[in-house]
């Protein structure tokens, strides 16, 4: 029997981006016009639901960053997941202000997000520049901890299967910036 005991692991890697790279991305976000984030993969007609997801987003197209993200996805997939992955979606910068949050959700589902396999989140903000805004997973990790909170270290990347339930807790003070993207593949088999 073929097994993959690591199929739901969450990978953390510090220093994916330097402090100066994070600051540069935050400045880029603030220099452009962002939009309210919508819900994806739903049949709900109300795609702007700030009770569920309250954040601003901006698509960024930067070749060096995209290539670096693809490489880390591929390495994580080879070492841990062994999923059938093919292409990366666009990269988005996110800004959570006071009251900003994203309730429990998964990154794969119906329609346009049905082939997402892996998710990545890069922490751009300094960990002490905001309160709340924790990335939490609603699973038990390899040490038996459930609903655990991931790292807030600036420049760190978190990679995880798109089907894992997770959330961003409400921001109570300050601003949280992050970068997100996903790796897609053929239909789950």
Q: Residue ranges of each PLM-predicted region?
A:
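Non-heme Fe(II)/2-oxoglutarate
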Residues: 1-85, 101
């Amino acid at each position: 029997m073929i097994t993959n005991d690591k199929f739901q692991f969450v990978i953390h890697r510090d220093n994916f981006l330097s402090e100066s790279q994070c600051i540069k991305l935050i400045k880029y976000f603030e220099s452009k016009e962002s939009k309210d984030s919508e819900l994806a993969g739903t049949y709900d007609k109300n795609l702007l639901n700030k009770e569920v997801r309250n954040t601003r987003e901006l698509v960024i197209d930067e070749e060096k960053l995209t290539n670096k993200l693809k490489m880390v996805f591929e390495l994580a997939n080879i070492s841990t997941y062994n999923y059938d992955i093919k292409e990366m979606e666009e990269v988005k910068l996110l800004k959570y202000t006071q009251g900003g949050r994203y309730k429990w959700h998964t990154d794969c589902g119906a329609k346009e997000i049905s082939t997402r396999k892996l998710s990545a989140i890069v922490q751009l903000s300094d960990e002490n520049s905001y309160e709340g805004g924790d990335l939490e997973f609603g699973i038990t990790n390899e040490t038996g901890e459930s609903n655990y909170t991931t790292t807030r270290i600036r420049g760190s990347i978190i990679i995880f299967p798109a089907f894992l339930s997770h959330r961003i807790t409400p921001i109570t003070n300050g601003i949280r910036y992050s970068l997100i993207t996903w790796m897609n593949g053929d239909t789950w088999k």
